[in-house]
C-alpha cells in the first residue's frame, strides 16, 4: 500500500508541474545576445606637451536572436558602459540603461543603447618657454591625469523577469538585476 500512495503523490506532483507549466505565461528561453560596440575616438593636442586628451564615443548595438518557436514580447535588455578614472584607475559605471524589445519567433532584432561620451587626459608635463633678457628659459609643470577612459561593457537579456543571456567585454563586469 505504501508504494501505491507514493506513486499517487508522485503522479499528482508530475501532473501539477505539467499543468502549471502549460497554463503559465510562456517565456521564450532561447534568446541570445551578440554585442557590437560602435566607437570613435578623437584626440586633441595639449599645448606644450606631447600628451593628447582623448574623447571616446561608445554605443552598444545588441543583436537578439530568438531561437524559440514563440514570439517574445517582454524582452528587456539591460546594458552598462564602464570606464576607469585616469587619476586613480578606479572602475566606474559611466552610463547604464534599459531597452525593451519584441522578437518574432525564429528571428533576430537589434536594439541600441544610448551614445556615451567619455573624456580624459593622461598625466603629462607641460613645458613653457620664456625669454628674459634675450635668454630662453624653459620651465615645466606636471599635470595630473583627469577624466575617464573606456574600459568595457556588460549586457543582460531578460524575458518575463528571467535572465536568458548575459555577455560582457570582461568577465568581471556584470549587470545587477
Predicted regions span which residues?
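Hydrophobic beta-strand positions in extracellular immunoglobulin-like domains
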Residues: 64-66, 81, 157
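Contiguous beta-strand segments within globular domains
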Residues: 51-64, 72-74, 117-118, 131
Amino acid at each position: 500500500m505504501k508504494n501505491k500512495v507514493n506513486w499517487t503523490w508522485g503522479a499528482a506532483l508530475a501532473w501539477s508541474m505539467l499543468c502549471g507549466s502549460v497554463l503559465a505565461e510562456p517565456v521564450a528561453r532561447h534568446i541570445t545576445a551578440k554585442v557590437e560596440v560602435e566607437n570613435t575616438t578623437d584626440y586633441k593636442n595639449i599645448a606644450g606637451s606631447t600628451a593628447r586628451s582623448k574623447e571616446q564615443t561608445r554605443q552598444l548595438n545588441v543583436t537578439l536572436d530568438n531561437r524559440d518557436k514563440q514570439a517574445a514580447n517582454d524582452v528587456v535588455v539591460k546594458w552598462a558602459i564602464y570606464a576607469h578614472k585616469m587619476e586613480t584607475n578606479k572602475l566606474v559605471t559611466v552610463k547604464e540603461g534599459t531597452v525593451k524589445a519584441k522578437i518574432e519567433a525564429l528571428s533576430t532584432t537589434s536594439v541600441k543603447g544610448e551614445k556615451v561620451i567619455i573624456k580624459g587626459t593622461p598625466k603629462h608635463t607641460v613645458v613653457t618657454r620664456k625669454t628674459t633678457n634675450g635668454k630662453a628659459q624653459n620651465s615645466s609643470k606636471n599635470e595630473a591625469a583627469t577624466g575617464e577612459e573606456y574600459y568595457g561593457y556588460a549586457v543582460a537579456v531578460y524575458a518575463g523577469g528571467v535572465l536568458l543571456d548575459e555577455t560582457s567585454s570582461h568577465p568581471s563586469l556584470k549587470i545587477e538585476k
